[in-house]
């Protein structure tokens, strides 16, 4: 299993000093970790597009990989729960927020694909879908003047991918993994704080290893 960390240069220090070491400690081989560092400062949307093109040109389209962002902390059983995927059809979300838990329905695990896109903090995507995104973007987004004007240059990488997969594969499912595989700790490492539409911080609905967050906070305080 391969893992791609989507990183901006300002957070590379956290990825190299904390995130990757925590992955190695659980048994993930370094050669299976791809750090996609946005050194060109493309921004989320362009960087996501280029990472999809990289996968299309360099990775097997019969396989898939986990995509995680540079401002997360992984659960203590992250590798155990991500190292194998029973099938290569559905998307798997390792990050689910409280606002999706309506009447407990997210505990059921499997939802229609149109709900998956909010979980780009940690998501498993079959490589064939990321490859198809390149064609879809070039065909539908670039050629649609209004669509391109609305989203070009923005941070709508997750939304654009949601639109792509919903259009091309409307029958696939999103498998939501609870307890969550990661928690969002941008507030500890700086440079952005994401909020949902209700103004609440974008945190995992259920991250069982809160002690890891406390441990990281202490390490970061010592680092300063």
Task: Identify the residue ranges that each predicted region occupies.
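Peripheral/terminal regions associated with large enzymatic or DNA-binding modules
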Residues: 1-68, 72-224
């Amino acid at each position: 299993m391969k893992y791609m960390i989507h990183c901006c240069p300002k957070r590379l220090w956290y990825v190299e000093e904390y995130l990757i070491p925590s992955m190695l400690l659980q048994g993930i081989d370094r050669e299976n970790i791809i750090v996609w560092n946005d050194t060109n400062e493309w921004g989320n949307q362009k960087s996501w597009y280029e990472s999809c093109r990289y996968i299309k040109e360099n990775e097997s389209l019969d396989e898939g990989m986990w995509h995680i962002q540079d401002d997360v902390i992984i659960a203590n059983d992250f590798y155990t729960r991500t190292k194998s995927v029973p099938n290569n059809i559905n998307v798997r979300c390792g990050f689910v927020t409280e606002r999706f838990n309506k009447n407990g329905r997210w505990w059921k695990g499997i939802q229609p694909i149109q709900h998956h896109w909010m979980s780009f903090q940690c998501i498993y995507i079959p490589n064939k879908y990321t490859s198809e995104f390149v064609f879809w973007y070039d065909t539908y987004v670039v050629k649609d003047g209004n669509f391109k004007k609305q989203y070009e240059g923005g941070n709508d990488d997750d939304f654009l991918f949601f639109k792509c997969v919903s259009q091309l594969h409307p029958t696939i499912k999103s498998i939501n993994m609870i307890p969550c595989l990661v928690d969002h700790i941008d507030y500890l490492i700086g440079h952005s704080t994401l909020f949902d539409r209700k103004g609440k911080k974008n945190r995992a609905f259920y991250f069982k290893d809160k002690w890891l967050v406390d441990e990281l906070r202490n390490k970061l305080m010592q680092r300063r």
